[in-house]
Amino acid sequence: KEMHPNTLKCIEYGAKVVEVPYGYLTVVEKHAKDYCLLTGAKKLVFGAKTMENKILIGNRMRQVIQQLGKEPEEIWCAIGSGTLVDSILLATETAKIYGVQVGAEYTGKHERLTVLKYPKSFDKLSKFVADFPSMPNYDLKAFELCIKHKQSNDVLFWNVL
């Protein structure tokens, strides 16, 4: 089986990749927990969803806003675990945030947040064409809905790739 380009990039940067048979997230999580018990490694929570990580991502959002000179009217991103959208909400005051749920169900609520569910499952790829690199099962789905549903032209799209 050919490795995903992101996996190859992780290996290039020194990551040790242990592949397991794919399946439900609970099965993959069990493999990860067993590996950590066996090796003493530390397992990150799904989406690295810690307050420390949210603060780091939020700080990056503030840097982007500073570079833009103002908060955009709309910020769009994909939602997997919810870490990114939670971080954006922490770092902004006025922007309307649009999160496109592409995988796990996101249950967070905020007055400035609108969550749109992508109509196809995580494993189904978006066929939308963007003029920048984007993951077709993740960010590209959010960009597709951003282009279709944005309410203004003052939009920031956060592409994780």
Where are these regions (language model features)?
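A short acidic Gly-Thr/Ser loop motif
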Residues: 78-83, 139, 160-161
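Structural motif
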Residues: 43-45, 76-78, 156-158
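Small/polar-residue-rich loop-to-helix segments that shape phosphate-bearing ligand pockets
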Residues: 2-70, 110-133
